Amino acid sequence: VCREGDITDLKERIIETSLVLFEKHGFHGVTVNDIVRESGTSKGGFYHHFHSKDELLFVIHDYFISYVLTKAQEANATSQTPTEQLQKIITSFVKVFDLYKPHLTVFYQESTYLKPQYEKAIKVKRDSYKNVLFQVLREGMASGEFRNELPVEITGMSILGMVNWTHKWYQKEGKYTIEEIADIYVDLVLQSLLTEEKKRSSTYRAYFLSKSAASHKKNNNEFCTGQTNQSV
């Protein structure tokens, strides 16, 4: 009899194995037999967890999308101000590129192969995440924290685009930790978004990079910013 922990471990082993194989050979270059052989399981074990290879690809995508959506909803429930909520949303979004880097690599390589029903399910979660972000921006503008002359949609999509591009250059062994990168993004966004009055408040300045930290980063900056494939 399989215990719950054994079943969970088997599912994770199948996912981890498929991530390596999909990244190396592509979605269509890998068969269920390949996954079964490399993960040391059986076809019965595979089909106990996944109806098909297509569902496995969906689960890989769903892992990190569900993570950022849950974190955004938690930020909404636990934050005192829109600024705090936005800081938490950006930070959790950035961290996904460290926590789920293999999943994201496969996502960007193989997302075109998602079946329509799975693509629709992913889109629902992505839209929900986007709506949470847009609502935070609206609330921040209504409360007087954020500049209300900025269009919500363009501002929100700019934040999403900036953070999404992290997958192009982030490396775990790079100069900056994922936490430092998150702090830099938060500073960039809030410096642009907060009203001048709020930026003068010590409460809101606490979200900015300290001068000593900024100086340290500047002195240690050795990478060429003109190369988009340069790891940081």
Features from the language model and the residues they span:
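Short amphipathic alpha-helical elements of helix-turn-helix/winged-helix folds
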Residues: 17-21, 96, 162
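Short, intrinsically disordered C-terminal tails of secreted or membrane-associated proteins
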Residues: 225-230
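Helix-turn-helix
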Residues: 2, 13, 21-55, 59
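Amphipathic alpha-helical packing segments from all-alpha helical-bundle domains
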Residues: 66-69, 73, 117-143, 153-157, ...
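Hydrophobic/aromatic-rich alpha-helical bundle segments in the mid-to-C-terminal region
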Residues: 104-109, 141-187, 196-216, 224
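Hydrophobic alpha-helical connector segments
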Residues: 59, 74-103, 152, 156-159, ...
